[in-house]
Amino acid sequence: MHEQLPLHDRALEARLIELETRLSFQEQALNELSEALADARLTGARNAELIRHLLEDLGKVRSTLFADAADEPPPPHY
């Protein structure tokens, strides 16, 4: 089939095949990046929830240790 096409048309067809191949790879890369972004967002949400719980626990511990504000040590810059 290629032998019947003029040289210009064969070059055009080769370029079209190259572009279709690149597009296919770009679509695959986009899907992989999309999945990675979704995973990163999920990890970030989990970490934010974990930090929230840890801060709550820290507040409870501080309340127990320093029930009176006078018992609390001064900030480090004093």
From Swiss-Prot:
Residues forming coiled coils: none
Record-stated family: Belongs to the SlyX family.
NCBIfam families: PRK00846.1
Protein name: Protein SlyX homolog
Species, as recorded: Xanthomonas euvesicatoria pv. vesicatoria (strain 85-10) (Xanthomonas campestris pv. vesicatoria)
